[in-house]
Amino acid sequence: MSHGDSNPAAVPHAADDIQGDDRWMSQHNRFVSDCKDKEPDVLFVGDSMVQLLQQYEIWRELFSPLHALNFWIGGDTTGHVLWRLKNGELENIKPKVIVVWVGTNNYGNTAEEVAGGIEAIVRLINTQQPQAKVIVLGLLPRGEKPNPLRQKNAKVNHLLKASLPKLPNVQLLDVDAGFVHSDGTISYHDMFDFLHLTGGAYAKICKPLHELIMQLLEETPEEKRAALA
């Protein structure tokens, strides 16, 4: 598997300001500011898959009560998230759980490179936030019909199942709620554009995620000490 500077998916870099309005950097700066003003117990980091989660009622129902922050930027790749985390989005906070969901936008990378990029994110979190338990969400299938990107995302998940157990304080959560039907298609009822999830689909994946987060929060030393007091 590709690691370090030899892996382009593991090289931190800011997104190019293609449209010319500097929105990507503005969003990053807002997240850095949030780190100075808020005290999250749970931090979500990733791309538009994380972004849209915050737009549905399931976020307010399950995650807002956990003092969660959502550091999303649509279109982000592993390299973009690495850059953001290296440049302030992990400073001045001490979350107990960090959820990472990124990789489906790494179109130009191999499965090995994408998995290596996700591992690099986990290693960075381990270094900068050693107290945090990390949850990596598996990449979902995409496209209405079978296609190479589906196959690549599945391979990324397979690679992560083998590699992540070797890293501390991290586990992979498969959140595919059977989105691919027996005929190989994905319904727009689950993914409205055959990539991004509908509210109903988020409800399916968030229940096991919420259960795992609650389990990890209860396992933190602070919670244990409080229970013994």
Curated annotation (Swiss-Prot):
BP GO terms, sorted: lipid catabolic process; spermatogenesis
EC number(s) given by UniProt: 3.1.1.47
Active-site residues per Swiss-Prot or TrEMBL entry: 48, 193, 196
Keyword annotations: Cytoplasm, Hydrolase, Lipid degradation, Lipid metabolism
Molecular functions (GO terms): 1-alkyl-2-acetylglycerophosphocholine esterase activity; platelet-activating factor acetyltransferase activity; protein heterodimerization activity; protein homodimerization activity
Pfam families listed in its UniProt record: Lipase_GDSL_2
Record-annotated membrane-spanning stretches: none
Coiled-coil blocks: none
Main location: cytoplasm
Cell compartments where the protein resides: Cytoplasm
Reactions performed catalytically: a 1-O-alkyl-2-acetyl-sn-glycero-3-phosphocholine + H2O = a 1-O-alkyl-sn-glycero-3-phosphocholine + acetate + H(+); 1-O-hexadecyl-2-acetyl-sn-glycero-3-phosphocholine + H2O = 1-O-hexadecyl-sn-glycero-3-phosphocholine + acetate + H(+); 1-O-hexadecyl-2-acetyl-sn-glycero-3-phosphate + H2O = 1-O-hexadecyl-sn-glycero-3-phosphate + acetate + H(+); 1-O-hexadecyl-2-acetyl-sn-glycero-3-phosphoethanolamine + H2O = 1-O-hexadecyl-sn-glycero-3-phosphoethanolamine + acetate + H(+)
Gene3D superfamilies with a match to the protein in the record: SGNH hydrolase
Additional note from the record: Originally the subunits of the type I platelet-activating factor (PAF) acetylhydrolase was named alpha (PAFAH1B1), beta (PAFAH1B2) and gamma (PAFAH1B3). Now these subunits have been renamed beta (PAFAH1B1), alpha2 (PAFAH1B2) and alpha1 (PAFAH1B3) respectively.
Sequence similarity: Belongs to the 'GDSL' lipolytic enzyme family. Platelet-activating factor acetylhydrolase IB beta/gamma subunits subfamily.
Quaternary structure and partners: Forms a catalytic dimer which is either homodimer (alpha2/alpha2 homodimer) or heterodimer with PAFAH1B3 (alpha2/alpha1 heterodimer). Component of the cytosolic (PAF-AH (I)) heterotetrameric enzyme, which is composed of PAFAH1B1 (beta), PAFAH1B2 (alpha2) and PAFAH1B3 (alpha1) subunits. The catalytic activity of the enzyme resides in the alpha1 (PAFAH1B3) and alpha2 (PAFAH1B2) subunits, whereas the beta subunit (PAFAH1B1) has regulatory activity. Trimer formation is not essential for the catalytic activity.
Role description: Alpha2 catalytic subunit of the cytosolic type I platelet-activating factor (PAF) acetylhydrolase (PAF-AH (I)) heterotetrameric enzyme that catalyzes the hydrolyze of the acetyl group at the sn-2 position of PAF and its analogs and modulates the action of PAF.
UniProt name for this protein: Platelet-activating factor acetylhydrolase IB subunit alpha2
Record gene name: PAFAH1B2
